[in-house]
Every structure is written in C-alpha cells, then in structure tokens.
Amino acid sequence: MFKRFIFITLSLLVFACFKSNKKSIKSDKVVVGVLAHGSFYDKGYNQSVHDGVVKLRDNFGIKLITKSLRPYPIEGKRLLTVDEAMTEDAYEVQKNPLNLFWLIGYRFSDLSVKLSYERPDIYYGIIDAFDYGDIQVPKNSLAIKFRNEEAAFLAGYIAAKMSRKEKIGFLTGPMSEHLKDFKFGFKAGIFYANPKLRLVSKKAPSLFDKEKGKAMALFMYKEDKVGVIFPIAGITGLGVYDAAKELGPKYYVIGLNQDQSYIAPQNVITSIIKDIGKVIYSISSEYINNRVFKGGIIIDRGLKEGVIEIVKDPDVLNNRLVDEVIDLENKIISGEIIVPDSEYAFDLFKSKL
C-alpha cells in the first residue's frame, strides 16, 4: 500500500510541475485505445472486452487501437520494473490521437491515475480498479468496479447442489488477493446451500500455462476429491476444462466472463457472465453520440444493473434448482441477502444464518 501511495504521489507532483502543451483532440472520428494484460482471445475476460470494442467499431466507425502488455521481463530491457514496462506500453498506445483509453484489469489501477494527470486531453476508463481509498479519481478518468461476489454466490450455491463430493475447488492465478470478492461470495453460496461442504483453494504460479492448469485440476479432482472447480486463472484456467473432459462427465467446472459451456458441454454446469464489453460499449457510445464523459467517479455494477448474471440452463440444472437460483437472485437484488466480499463479511454472514 505504501509503495502504491508513493507511486501515485510522485505522479501528482510531476504533473503539478508540468504544464501540458497538448490540445484537446478535435476530430470527427473518435479514436479508442485498449490496453490489456494477455490475449484478447482468451475465451473469457479479455474476449468480452474485445467483443465489446469491436461492436463499437462496427456500429460507430471509430478507429480502434488494441494492445496487450509485452511479456515481462522484456527482452533487451530487463532492468525495467513491471510498472515502467506497463507505462511504456501505455505510452505506445498514446502515440495515437486518442479520445478514449480503456485500461483492462486491476493491475492498471495506479497507472490510470498517473496517465490521467499527465494527459488531461484523453478520457480514461479503468476496469476492475482497486479501491483508491482517499485518492480522488481524476476528472478525466472513470473507475469501474463489479459486485463479483453476487454472481459468485449463485455459482457457489449451484456447485454445492450439483457436486457429488464433499469438497468444492477454487483455482486462481498468482495475484489472488484482488479476487477475494469472488472467493468469499462463492464460499458463502456453498455454505448457504450446504454448511458441511468445504472449499479447497489453490493458486497457480502463472496465468498463461494451460498445461499447469490441467495438471493442478487433475490433482484437485483425483487427490483432493473436489466435485466442482471454479477457475479464475486466465489461460491457465482453460486447463481445468481439459482435465474435466479427460476425466468424464461427472467432473464439473464453472465458467467465467462468458457462457463457457461450449468448451466442455458435459462438464460446465454454469457460467458467471461478466459483460465487461457491455459496460465499455455503453460508456463509449454515450461519449461518441454526445461528446459527454462523466469522469471523476467510481461506477459499481452487479446483478441489478444486468451486467453480471449466472447461466441457468434447465437442461443441466433441474427445474427446481433453476427456480431456487432465480429466487436467490431476486433476494440479492432486493437487498434481502447481502453477499459477503471479504473474510470479515463472510464470518458475519455465517453468524446470521
């Protein structure tokens, strides 16, 4: 936290001494930049972003600039820190006459503040931003957060009802701290359905190793005896689907970001749909149509706004379970059920049941 504070504070001091000579872009054709970590064709998180911005390009005729972060450490620049490498990649995108610049993922939280103050002529959007605490979101920037715990709760409930084992698996990548809303929402859903079930959490060393994901999933299914695995591990997580398909139709997976049942039709029991592309499309199209950007705020989206939802396929779940999930959805939307997004909130949730 101290490191993050110093990083942002120094950025603000630099900006305070810097008078930008760049003029606001005055062009009929809107230019939108997108910077992400990993492939835009990951069948999940970045794919949702890609689909949204491509739809934006096709419908409005914008110029679209997309870039993935270079793999770190960068060949020939091994002395660069991770933050410096990300900044270089962002500057590369900003060589274009951008109107809007979307930064995809929590890792850009600090950088988005720095860039916003350096380039007041560009509007920025950060997806899945960290909690900025007392730091004010710049007027030309917009932070978007999602109530991931709400859909994770429903996924946990479904997993508990469908599992043939007494353990449920949860697989993340190396940076799992920012996924606590998913974890404790999922855990709460399991507990709500069956307090006797146990959550087995594992952390993969990389987000880009599909074979490692498969090996870890095989171990979780066969040795840990989990009945369902919920992977949030990028490309690594796709290995879970391969493991489940190899073991057979009784080994279940929960998809994320898109309906991923097509990857393993006999194994995927539900998917959390987190339509990031829909949010980007909505905000960007408002700017394109009206040249209005409502910055300086944090936007929160969940079940109520229709941005996050859970797949309820009656051919996979029985009709009774579908009805139960719909009932739980309504209770979450109405506020009757407050889904926990942290360990403390989870303990409080348990104590009230």
Swiss-Prot record:
Q: Does the keyword Lipoprotein apply?
A: yes
Q: Record's InterPro entries?
A: BMP_lipoprotein, Peripla_BP_I, PnrA-like
Q: What is this protein called?
A: Basic membrane protein C
The protein's UniProt keywords, in alphabetical order, are: Cell inner membrane, Cell membrane, Lipoprotein, Membrane, Palmitate, Signal, Transport
Q: Where is the lipid attached (S-diacylglycerol cysteine)?
A: C17
| Location of the protein in the cell | Cell inner membrane
Q: What does this protein do?
A: May be part of an ABC-type nucleoside uptake system involved in the purine salvage pathway.
Return the similarity comment. Answer: Belongs to the BMP lipoprotein family.
Membrane-topology annotation of the record: Lipid-anchor
Any keyword Nucleotide-binding? Answer: no
Q: Which species expresses this protein natively? A: Borreliella burgdorferi (strain N40) (Borrelia burgdorferi)
Q: Where does the record locate the signal sequence feature?
A: 1-16
Residues with lipid group (N-palmitoyl cysteine): C17
Self-association state and partner proteins as the record states = Monomer.
Name the domain of life: Bacteria
A GO CC term attached to the entry: plasma membrane
Cited PANTHER family: ABC TRANSPORTER GUANOSINE-BINDING PROTEIN NUPN, TRANSCRIPTIONAL ACTIVATOR PROTEIN MED
For this protein's source organism, the top of the classification is: Bacteria, Pseudomonadati, Spirochaetota, Spirochaetia, Spirochaetales
